Amino acid sequence: MFYYLNGTITLLDANLAVVDCGGVGYACHTTNYTLARLQLGKSAKLFTYCNIKEDAFDIFGFSTREELNCFERLLGVTGVGPKAALAILSVVSPEQLTLAVMTQDDKTITMAQGVGKKLAQRIILELKDKLLSLIHI
């Protein structure tokens, strides 16, 4: 859809940032890590993922491409939707997620709300060969 939004941050809330781009406010669901980097009234660039469903159009925004790439890889795991992927990246950085996957540390992944042991183990199994190339640790 669109790769990023570049504009002024007009609202910050729990896992939500609104970016004003040319007079249009785009609500972006985001992680705690991205929220910590944003400031009200300041310019920001968020890399985006658009989730279009029959009854909704959701935008997910990330401060780095690495975070966006990890989000997209998580969505490729059976049983992981946008909310679970966002929850995971709200408690671990892309680097921490990669380390958890490489060391088969399912406890780190289960720190995310709504992610149990079985799903964490599936994430490890399905992402073991895919995550290392996405980030620089």
Question: What is the role of each PLM region?
Answer:
Residues 1, 70-76, 85-88, 100, ...:
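Residue-level recognition of specific faces of alpha-helices
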Residues 1-76:
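Structure-specific DNA junction-binding interface
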Residues 14, 22, 67, 94, ...:
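ATP/adenylate-binding site constellation spanning eukaryotic-like Ser/Thr protein kinases
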Residues 57-61, 82-101, 122-133:
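Amphipathic, charged-and-aliphatic alpha-helical interface segments
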Residues 104-115, 122-126:
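Anionic-ligand binding region
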Residues 135-137:
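Conserved small/polar residues in nucleotide/adenosyl-binding loops
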